[in-house]
């Protein structure tokens, strides 16, 4: 039976990583890949904000998880106000790669979604992709760098900006759209925890109820986003190549993320 980075037995559907004060952490391993195989456990993790982590959470990240690279997709004003908590002094490569709707858009978090109770998530994700090519390609290159694994990437909720990057990574290596959409929808299991935490923080107060507006988590949203990515760009791999990733780097991404059979 495969094991995760903590050495515990895993199955493909058992990808949650539990922490005391980080609510929405999943290993990107165990997902099916077209033409056979699965994604590799213990390499890349997606997460909600880790800023409230405890000493025990830190010990798990630096020990069993083996965290070496933290990719922060939040905007500069979020980083300034919310910070990193204990991770601020950790021996971890920390890289801020803001994901926003356009290179010219405001760097204020509130401008990502002016009305959090009413938002077209497919349109938002398409704009985040278009406005953040440099950050997303840079994030992919950090994932490729096997000398600095494991990698954890996060935003605030671990759903939207994190979901776009996860979708690009997984689609680029051949994970089927249905599996990517199912992974995206898993955040719904933890959204009540995420909402309560974020609503208590200065940058995010006033969030709508769970499953409403920006807090919606439906697999169909990700299916539609991936369909648009395919129709407009030929899929994530072609989008990354158009954004400056080389064919050699794309091959290395696949080698890093796909487990040998």
Question: Which residues are covered by each model-predicted region?
Answer:
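Cys-dependent protein tyrosine phosphatase-like superfamily
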Residues: 1-152, 164-261
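Ser/Thr-glycine-rich phosphate-binding loops at phosphate-binding pockets of nucleotides
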Residues: 157, 161-162
């Amino acid at each position: 039976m495969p094991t995760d980075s903590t050495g515990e037995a895993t199955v493909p559907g058992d990808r949650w990583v539990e922490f005391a004060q980080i609510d929405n952490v999943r290993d990107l391993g165990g997902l099916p890949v077209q033409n056979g195989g699965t994604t590799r456990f213990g390499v890349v993790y997606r997460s909600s904000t880790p800023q409230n982590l405890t000493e025990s959470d830190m010990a798990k990240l630096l020990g069993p998880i083996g965290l070496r690279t933290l990719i922060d997709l939040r905007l500069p004003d979020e980083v300034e106000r919310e910070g990193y908590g204990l991770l601020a002094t950790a021996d971890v490569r920390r890289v801020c790669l803001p994901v926003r709707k356009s290179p010219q858009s405001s760097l204020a978090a509130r401008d990502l979604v002016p009305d959090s109770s009413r938002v077209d998530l497919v349109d938002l994700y398409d704009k985040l992709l278009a406005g953040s090519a440099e950050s997303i390609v840079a994030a992919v290159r950090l994932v490729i760098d096997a000398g600095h694994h494991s990698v954890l990437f996060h935003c605030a909720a671990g759903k939207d900006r994190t979901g776009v990057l996860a979708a690009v990574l997984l689609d680029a290596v051949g994970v089927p759209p249905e599996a990517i959409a199912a992974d995206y929808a898993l955040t719904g299991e933890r959204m009540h925890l995420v909402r309560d935490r974020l609503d208590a923080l200065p940058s995010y107060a006033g969030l709508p109820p769970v499953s409403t507006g920006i807090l919606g988590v439906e697999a169909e949203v990700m299916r539609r986003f991936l369909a648009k990515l395919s129709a407009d760009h030929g899929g994530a791999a072609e989008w990354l190549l158009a954004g400056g990733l080389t064919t050699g780097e794309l091959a290395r991404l696949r080698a890093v993320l796909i487990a040998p059979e």
